[in-house]
Amino acid sequence: MYDHFNSPSIDILYDYGPFLKKCEMTGGIGSYSAGTPTPRVAIVGAGISGLVAATELLRAGVKDVVLYESRDRIGGRVWSQVFDQTRPRYIAEMGAMRFPPSATGLFHYLKKFGISTSTTFPDPGVVDTELHYRGKRYHWPAGKKPPELFRRVYEGWQSLLSEGYLLEGGSLVAPLDITAMLKSGRLEEAAIAWQGWLNVFRDCSFYNAIVCIFTGRHPPGGDRWARPEDFELFGSLGIGSGGFLPVFQAGFTEILRMVINGYQSDQRLIPDGISSLAARLADQSFDGKALRDRVCFSRVGRISREAEKIIIQTEAGEQRVFDRVIVTSSNRAMQMIHCLTDSESFLSRDVARAVRETHLTGSSKLFILTRTKFWIKNKLPTTIQSDGLVRGVYCLDYQPDEPEGHGVVLLSYTWEDDAQKMLAMPDKKTRCQVLVDDLAAIHPTFASYLLPVDGDYERYVLHHDWLTDPHSAGAFKLNYPGEDVYSQRLFFQPMTANSPNKDTGLYLAGCSCSFAGGWIEGAVQTALNSACAVLRSTGGQLSKGNPLDCINASYRY
């Protein structure tokens, strides 16, 4: 379940898994020599990034670490919400819910705490799936090719991934071949191949790129796609984890890197909920004090400088002074609440622009706890992908050893424009009933089972809109065309610790400051970058193979 394989990420040509494995055996990411004073460190945000950074700093010998959290819980956008405290096994993953093993930094911590990832996430085509398209239902058996109507776009996309793209006067290496290069350690070849894709498509949206690729002279798979029909079909089918029509305006290279990094393959579900990782991190004890007891549940306002010190001011009026600060809050909070982009006190103009302009998606979810696992008993699809209002429907079995247990149905998972539609229905009962009616128009039998336990909509229907979440103002980073350079600036910001003349003592972290927005791996990677930056800039010694010494900006975005 946890077997490690080499899985460097394409944009950084580095794998955090081996470094973490070595550090686990040697004691930490670094250390301080006897007599070297250790810094006082504030971490803004007690999500996975903040908790990982705190863990590694405390293991390395930093004594004074304070985490600030504006919510009333730890975890941030990692949020396994329980329907009912009397039924704690039934959860709604409001944030991250799919976990690919190629996320080796994340899987290191899952293994460390013995958190099971044995269950496959019910992605389309992995389980029995139904595609609802233009008022008709199409059955897609588990492990088989999709229905004939979708065959051309499916095979075309698969051919692009496995064969690459033939240009006039040249070709681009198959994305899956780039993945193989990464896994086999042929990093220079992988970098050259990825730069080729960047050179051609860095300024193209996902939609513009696939139109160029599949209507040109050399379409992968051999068949040109028809406009607009095949592109509408592809938007509903997606690339492995559901329909991508709502993100057609995202950057093509942003989507392609997910495939190359393996994030769309073998996605796992965590039966105990991903919040169990946040809880296990917080339960660790250092010097007789639990990590969770270092969390101050208070919202940080402005972050400012006074000589060589950094001032944290909470909205309750408290001020505290620190030597180093790691900020893991959302990019919107960095700009509007912490005021980090107001001057060059902490961030260069280039980095400040990246903070301000990086695109965050809107996303909404609605879950129902049903009386039974009706899809199993009645041989109904486990997953539905629809061109209607519901978009993605996923049936989740959190107690497979109990046939008579309840079911959890993610009735609606939407992105961007589709998520914005949900904002017009803030009342969850109304929203739920509208979604059920939408589904009933095509599959009335399935829809008839979508009633919460005991008819209790208040308790057994859970929903969340990330766009209006005051702590996030968006779900996750998803670059628009031309914005990959923003991810580069944000990811490498902690590397200023290598240059004393550029180092301000404040470091950015979180998945929106990575090349893996929306994936916990990005949160883990940037947490480690920032923790290493604290050690390096305050007289600590980093372990060999650390990211500050091994990762370089390798691409022209």
Curated annotation (Swiss-Prot):
The keyword Flavoprotein belongs to this UniProt entry's keyword annotation: yes
Catalytic activity: L-tryptophan + O2 = indole-3-acetamide + CO2 + H2O
Cofactor binding summary note: Binds 1 FMN per subunit.
Binding residue positions for substrate: R98
Effect of W466F: Slightly decreases enzyme activity
Pfam families reported in the protein's UniProt record: Amino_oxidase
Family: Belongs to the tryptophan 2-monooxygenase family.
Annotated protein name in UniProt: Tryptophan 2-monooxygenase
Organism of provenance: Pseudomonas savastanoi (Pseudomonas syringae pv. savastanoi)
